[in-house]
Amino acid sequence: MERIKELRNLMSQSRTREILTKTTVDHMAIIKKYTSGRQEKNPSLRMKWMMAMKYPITADKRITEMIPERNEQGQTLWSKMSDAGSDRVMVSPLAVTWWNRNGPMTSTVHYPKIYKTYFEKVERLKHGTFGPVHFRNQVKIRRRVDINPGHADLSAKEAQDVIMEVVFPNEVGARILTSESQLTITKEKKEELQDCKISPLMVAYMLERELVRKTRFLPVAGGTSSVYIEVLHLTQGTCWEQMYTPGGEVRNDDVDQSLIIAARNIVRRAAVSADPLASLLEMCHSTQIGGTRMVDILRQNPTEEQAVDICKAAMGLRISSSFSFGGFTFKRTSGSSVKREEEVLTGNLQTLKIRVHEGYEEFTMVGKRATAILRKTTRRLIQLIVSGRDEQSIAEAIIVAMVFSQEDCMIKAVRGDLNFVNRANQRLNPMHQLLRHFQKDAKVLFQNWGIEHIDNVMGMIGVLPDMTPSTEMSMRGVRVSKMGVDEYSSAERVVVSIDRFLRVRDQRGNVLLSPEEVSETQGTEKLTITYSSSMMWEINGPESVLVNTYQWIIRNWETVKIQWSQNPTMLYNKMEFEPFQSLVPKAIRGQYSGFVRTLFQQMRDVLGTFDTTQIIKLLPFAAAPPKQSRMQFSSLTVNVRGSGMRILVRGNSPVFNYNKTTKRLTILGKDAGTLTEDPDEGTSGVESAVLRGFLILGKEDRRYGPALSINELSNLAKGEKANVLIGQGDVVLVMKRKRDSSILTDSQTATKRIRMAIN
């Protein structure tokens, strides 16, 4: 009340009213700025001003029972005055010091677990090495980077469910933990955080850091993996850079790196198979990276790379709307075009059919080592502004832009024929033909492009056909800039479609990606990549193909054996035998196949010549299209270890060695597994024992369906008849007995009956 009276009193004085009503707006704005709202306008000043007071801090009343009134030096720690407007006490900064030194201790066991990301960061910095500082112009471009090392790749929603389940397990609310990673993390964290005294909110914040990828759009020159981004402020300024080697790696960077390598290998391999899309999906579904299924990683990981995006498109996931050409990511920033087929003549008078983009368009081009802005219209480059790390990188960007422009002088610069093919030996499309041609040698292209005088523009410089910089002249429309071009910042994802040749299109039908765009760069993955698909056996070389092929036969011997006798053609066409063909000398593949198939047919016809080891050994050779010839072979050659090695048709060799006593098969000295049945047991024990409870009726009868293996017999109902495959690859018809009492006699009669049925 007193205060209000005082204010009324002030307002009654004419001078006060005059000041408040007539003060100019700029002063008024300042007054407003510092007096309106709860937001502190000058925090540092406020802090200094507050800390100059004796008791700037308020604390809960209970503190007076836990802290002495004075410290050892006799300084007062808290005031007897209570804080105006709350029931807290006023405390001196010295009280905080006293508390830190003498306050109660608590268990620290949970700290490294909760603040895991911080502790790990300290370790990385401790073991990292900082090199010299270099002063030079930094070409930085903004890229979307991962700023949070050491995280899992859960979506925000998935992480939220995990955090709620770990931190507030008893709260109400629907939480569905479905993915493998969610369940594993939840279990792990619940165990780690038993009896944890750290505030739940803090735990939730820290868990979020650990579970979710956080990205920012930051100016970067150099490494973009998260262990470099966390020290960005230490390694690059506007005009300097400091060399740095991280003191440790984090799984999220390793996952990104290994995912790219796996995707590239898979796309390259799928492109050369008969049905690329089906093969790609089969491989993605059967591959694991660091023990996690590749398809799960693809669903969660936002890495944008050509091969990764092709795999995502195949799985029906959304991808970025930018497109790829010549290893650069193009994003249209303005303009539009329509496409029209046009026939053009190269300098060698070869006709090319190209899809011409008609209309004015502007693009940003972002590559690994160079970036550019491109303005073009129908078959004409208007302007190209490039920046890059070095001459080579700048030249690469210029070539791609010139080809993309579809200018006539570029097409006329072609010397010789264009006949580039992809890995599957199919001709590349015309635009990629042109690109490959000029990537090999761009001399004529640059020479024929034409040059022009240039104006002196800050930060821009000309470039001559031999790639030397110049301030007077430049190739027509081309300039080199000191500034980089930012990557496209939006993280929007669009629905795309993919055809069986792995060409990815947006909904308007524009091609965004194709296997030609997948980099040929080879790298060594940081995490173990396990390809279970037979298509990837060859990635580790011929020996791996050999071992894997035989391992596959042994693992699937039960079904292989049935197919061998019933439906050999289907067996020979199995894709698992495809990789093996590359080991067999091309000239003789057909003869080998014909020879082995004839041998197998004799085995089927002549009783008692079924030889498991020999069938396993020779089967892969029968997969090639056979040539009929009278040739006989005592050994077959395979190309491994850089030379031809022999597999003996009868008997063991260093390549294929079967040990009868241990039943183990070794291929090139490597263990390839154990055969579950002994090839040389004849009919004596196994069949008669297994055929107890069955009556052998006679020869195979096709009306009762395909032959079952002995293991499958147990599924028959009493009285049911079936064909069954017995040891030597012979098929007989049996019936399951209706009564169990007569089972004992079966063993004795089985052997006789089998012989009779077969003969």
From Swiss-Prot:
It holds the Pfam family Flu_PB2_3rd. GO terms for biological process: 7-methylguanosine mRNA capping; cap snatching; DNA-templated transcription; symbiont-mediated suppression of host cytoplasmic pattern recognition receptor signaling pathway via inhibition of MAVS activity; symbiont-mediated suppression of host gene expression; symbiont-mediated suppression of host mRNA transcription via inhibition of RNA polymerase II activity; viral RNA genome replication. Its main location: virion. The keyword Translocase does not apply. Plays an essential role in transcription initiation and cap-stealing mechanism, in which cellular capped pre-mRNAs are used to generate primers for viral transcription. Recognizes and binds the 7-methylguanosine-containing cap of the target pre-RNA which is subsequently cleaved after 10-13 nucleotides by the viral protein PA. Plays a role in the initiation of the viral genome replication and modulates the activity of the ribonucleoprotein (RNP) complex. Keywords: Cap snatching, Eukaryotic host gene expression shutoff by virus, Eukaryotic host transcription shutoff by virus, Host gene expression shutoff by virus, Host mitochondrion, Host nucleus, Host-virus interaction, Inhibition of host innate immune response by virus, Inhibition of host MAVS by virus, Inhibition of host RLR pathway by virus, Inhibition of host RNA polymerase II by virus, mRNA capping, mRNA processing, Viral immunoevasion, Viral transcription, Virion. This is Polymerase basic protein 2. Belongs to the influenza viruses PB2 family. It comes from Influenza A virus (strain A/Japan/305/1957 H2N2). The gene is PB2. It is found in: Virion; Host nucleus; Host mitochondrion. The record marks 627 as: Mammalian adaptation. HAMAP family: INV_PB2 (MF_04062). GO terms for molecular function: RNA binding; RNA-directed RNA polymerase activity. InterPro entries: Flu_PB2_2nd, Flu_PB2_6th, Flu_PB2_C, Flu_PB2_CAP-bd, Flu_PB2_middle, Flu_PB2_N, INV_PB2, PB2_helical. One of its GO terms (cellular component) is host cell mitochondrion. Influenza RNA polymerase is composed of three subunits: PB1, PB2 and PA. Interacts (via N-terminus) with PB1 (via C-terminus). Interacts with nucleoprotein NP (via N-terminus). Interacts (via N-terminus) with host MAVS (via N-terminus); this interaction inhibits host innate immune response. It comes from the Viruses. A motif (Nuclear localization signal) lies at residues 736-739.
